[in-house]
Structure formats: C-alpha cells, structure tokens
C-alpha cells in the first residue's frame, strides 16, 4: 500500500438531500489503517498524527452532513482538506473535495459545488478513481442545471453516463439517466427528458429498488404534467404514491397527493381530486404540517365549489379560516374570508357573505 492509499475498512453511502435528484451510490472509506510515508522518525510521526486527525475530521464532516449540520460539515471538511494537502495525500483530497461539493450542493451553493468538483476532477487526472469521478461529474451537471447552464449540465452528465455504462454500474446509470432527464426537462426538451427517465425506470425496476422507483416515477409524472399530459402524469403519480405509502414516506406521499389532486382538477375530475386532497389533509394533520393542512383545506374548498357543493366548500373554507386565526396568518385569513364571501354568494346566502366580507365571522 502506498503512502496515498487508505484502508477501506468501513464504508458509508453519501446521503443526498435534494428530493428531486438521485445521487450515485458512492462508498466512502473512513480512513482506517495507513502506511506511513518514508522519512525520518520525527517526520513519520508528524505525518501519522496529521493523517489521523484529518481522518477524524473527514468522518466528523460526513456525519455532520448526514445529520444536516451543513455549516459544521463544511468547517470540518475544509480542515481535513488542508491537512491532507499538507501531507500530500491525493486520494483523500479527492474524497474530501467530493464531500465538500456535495455539502455545497445540498446548501444550494452551486458555484462552490462547481469549484470543489472541478478541483476534484483535476486531481483525478493523475490518480484516477471512477467512483469519485462519476460523483463529481454528477454534482457538476446538477449544479449547472440549477444555474440554467443546460448545455454544460448535459455535457457533464453525458460523460457521467458514459462512465457508468463502462463500469456496468446499474445503480449509477439510474442516477445519471434520471439527472439527464431533469436537465432536459429544465431546458424544455420534454421528449428527450422522458426518453432518459423511462430508460432510468427500466433499470431501477430491474433492480427492484423501491426508493429509486419512487424518485424516477415522480420525475416522469412531473415531466408529463409540464407537458399538460395529465392522464399520463396521473398514471405515474399513482404508481409513485403507492410506493411512497409502502415505504412509509409520508411527506413524499403528501406532496404526490397534492400533484395528483392538481392533475385531476386540470382534467375536471374534481371527485377524484377530493379523494386525494382528503388523504393529503389526513397526512398533514398526522405530520402537524400547518402549511400542507391549509393548502389541503383550500384545495378541497375549490374542488367542492367546482362540483357545486357549496355547503361542503364552506365547511373547508371555515376550517381554513380557523387555522389562519390560530396561527395569526393575516394573508391566509384574508384569502379564506374572500373564498367564503364568494361561496356564500354562490349559495345565495348574501347576509352571511356580508358578514364574511366584514370579517365578523
């Protein structure tokens, strides 16, 4: 083992927080046993302590990233990088830079994501590591997408896909194809986006990876929704929400139910929309998610109103009004009162409409 190699005694999988992207499966060694570099005894001891401390900081930074402590993670990882640079450990510099890129991406600092990823790629020219390379390319592609530089994003993700195919790494192919779908969708090239996303779905189904299927199905649904192809969007969202329920991903299911309700409303299928919104309302209350609860009540009121069921619409709008007053949200209260005013008038109850108009109820 050379002085730059680490002992992969324990591996951690990088965690990606962004809900609409699938990161590559990237195993990170935790820097166990290392062979000391040649030199005097004093120099060897100094380097050993540097490496040991740097390794601990890297592990600490990874743990902080996984716990969502992003500022602390950046601090730990930057310190680790300086120490690995001081002893000339190239492989560990690559790994730290890859983590710094991930933490920056998770923090929505896309320029820093690009900076660290490009530094990582520069080191990879002399010390190749395909697993780290696909991660760096993935971060670059996704970061450029967020900066609306779709051409650059596509270039990096195409290179990422090429390497994953060369490695026959199917899980990483799923991520690369999915992320290419996202950048093509952002660029308005919906047909191309669907082509990549469906290829990603085929592989993830073959792998029987429910978590991956949930992500890919949601993204295909979103692309069809952007195309105003609501029946296809509904079909993919329904498959997706079944998996979210299976995995007990309650927050994900809540968001999908919102999308399903919106797509059903777009096709004037208000009865079905109400079923989805009612389920979302139950989940919102289970999660104690006030914002989702008020959105669900508003959506339910709208859907009932569209069906001409004004009494039921008023019930939901009144619940929204009570919630707005409970959390002292003036804007929400004004919206609820306006909805109640309009619905009462539609019902012919002008006296009650006047009371809502004046805010007396």
Question: What is each of the regions a protein language model found here?
Answer:
Residues 1-117, 121-123, 129, 359-361:
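Flexible inter-repeat linkers and adjacent short helices
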Residues 58-66, 92-106, 131-148, 157, ...:
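Conserved alpha-helical positions within TPR/SEL1-like repeat arrays
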Residues 317-318, 322, 334, 338-341, ...:
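TPR/TPR-like (Sel1-like) alpha-helical repeat modules
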């Amino acid at each position: 083992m050379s002085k730059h190699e680490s002992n992969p005694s324990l591996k951690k999988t990088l965690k990606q927080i962004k809900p609409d992207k699938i990161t590559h499966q990237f195993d990170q060694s935790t820097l166990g046993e290392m062979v000391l570099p040649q030199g005097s005894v004093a120099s060897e001891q100094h380097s050993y302590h540097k490496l040991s401390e740097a390794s601990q900081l890297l592990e600490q930074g990874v743990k902080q990233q996984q716990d969502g402590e992003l500022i602390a993670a950046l601090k730990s990882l930057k310190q680790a990088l300086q120490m690995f640079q001081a002893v000339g450990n190239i492989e560990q510099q690559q790994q730290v830079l890859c983590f710094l890129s991930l933490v920056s991406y998770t923090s929505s600092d896309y320029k820093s994501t690009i900076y660290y990823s490009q530094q990582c790629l520069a080191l990879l020219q002399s010390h190749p590591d395909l697993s780290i390379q696909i991660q760096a390319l993935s971060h670059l592609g996704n970061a450029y997408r967020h900066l609306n530089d779709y051409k650059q994003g596509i270039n990096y993700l195409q290179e990422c896909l090429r390497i994953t195919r060369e490695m026959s790494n199917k899980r990483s192919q799923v991520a690369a194809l999915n992320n290419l779908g996202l950048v093509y969708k952002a660029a308005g090239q919906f047909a191309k986006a669907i082509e990549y996303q469906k290829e990603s779905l085929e592989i993830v189904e073959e792998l029987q990876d429910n978590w991956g299927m949930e992500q890919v199905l949601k993204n295909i649904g979103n692309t069809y929704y952007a195309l105003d192809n609501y029946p296809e969007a509904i079909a993919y969202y329904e498959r997706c929400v079944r998996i979210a329920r299976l995995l007990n991903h309650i927050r994900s299911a809540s968001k999908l139910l919102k999308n399903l309700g919106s797509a059903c409303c777009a096709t004037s299928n208000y009865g079905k929309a109400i079923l989805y919104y009612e389920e979302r309302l139950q989940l919102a209350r289970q999660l104690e998610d006030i914002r989702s609860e008020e959105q669900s009540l508003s959506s339910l009121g709208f859907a009932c109103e569209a069906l001409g069921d004004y009494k039921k619409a008023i019930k939901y709008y009144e619940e929204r009004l009570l919630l707005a007053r409970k959390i002292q949200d003036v804007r929400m209260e004004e919206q609820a009162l306006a909805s109640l005013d309009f619905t009462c008038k539609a019902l012919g109850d002008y006296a009650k409409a006047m009371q809502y108009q004046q805010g007396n109820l």
